[in-house]
Amino acid sequence: MTYNFDEIIDRRHTNALNTDGFRGYIFHAGPEKVFPYKDEEFVRMWVADMEFGVAPEILDALRGRIDRRIFGYTGLYDDEYYNAFSKWCRDHYDWDFPREQLCVTPGIIPALYQLTETLCTKDEKVLVNTPAYGYFVHAAEYAGVGVLTSPLRKKADGTFEPDFEDFERKCADPACKLVFWCNPQNPTGRMWTEEELRKAAAIMEKYNLWVVSDEIHCDLIRCGRRHIPMAKVMTDYPKLITCMAPSKTFNLAGLAFSNIIIRDKTLRGRFRDRDKLFGMVNPMSLTAAKAAYERGGAWHEALKAYLDGNFAFVKEFFARELPEAVMYIPEATYLAWVDLGKCLPEDTDLPDFFANKAGVLLEGGNGLFVGNAAGYIRLNLAMPRSIIGTGLKRMAEAIRREQAK
């Protein structure tokens, strides 16, 4: 089957966060905030969901479930979903896990909040690498616990690596209880090597820390690469929790369905006991997730190839039009992490600048990515290439106008 990733789909007026909720999320404002551009004129390169239609194989499964006509209380009462997901894990990562370790939640973010509350007391802290996914810190703040940060080290080519000396110092803090490990890393797009994973694992095990490995981007990798779950490295470590989901890979975020794999039996029981949905799931979410893992393989491979082309397109654009910008093709994610430190004044509010001066919605800076992110923007490239081209052209023109002042 041929898949059309160049199709432009109108998402307005669907209550999509991407189109209808950006004021509150990016700018912490309501409808009173106005821009020189109409909402429909923005190029939206911000929140991490895709502008591509869902795989036809998944849509067919959803239509089939609709035809059953009843949408009563639903749970995972048979092994069909586990079998589909665990086979995907074996095929793609050469790894799987026992059925009893699988918990499902409406999302990884709710799981982060719940795990932090369950594992940490008020005098304890969580540790994150920076730049970081903001909800790692929000989960800690919600639970009333402290945050330790270990900045990733920037290399000469613009990519990042862990600073293991600093990471161990932070892990050794007596208050450190929990590490949020992002694998692949958001926003830098690093796929940690096996050596890096083993070094991090040895440190976390040495200090007997709980580890939440957020692996939601693990299937959004460059063609020819293979994800290494932290669980393949920490093979017997009982305090590891692995978080995966079909949502990012198959553009199903609104269906709110994620996999939380908890090894420790006691924690697993506490996690399930605190489940506000009592083990219930949305029947359409379950149908879509199962179909994704069973039938979505061909679409997934085509998606990766298209994303690789998008990254090459963006890399070439910056090299030609904005050579002072530092952009590398990441090993994973559909997110470009671009250093504009030499393009604009360091105190520039980048999301506000590009919204007002270019009509482009994006995220960036320390306010959204915790720290170690000044001068950086994160660009979502999971969209038709023609839209990316329009957005980049607007951004380059806005930067040139600003530089000419």
Task: Go through each PLM region and give its residues.
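Helix C-cap/helix->beta junction micro-motif
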Residues: A143, K206-Y207, A358, E402
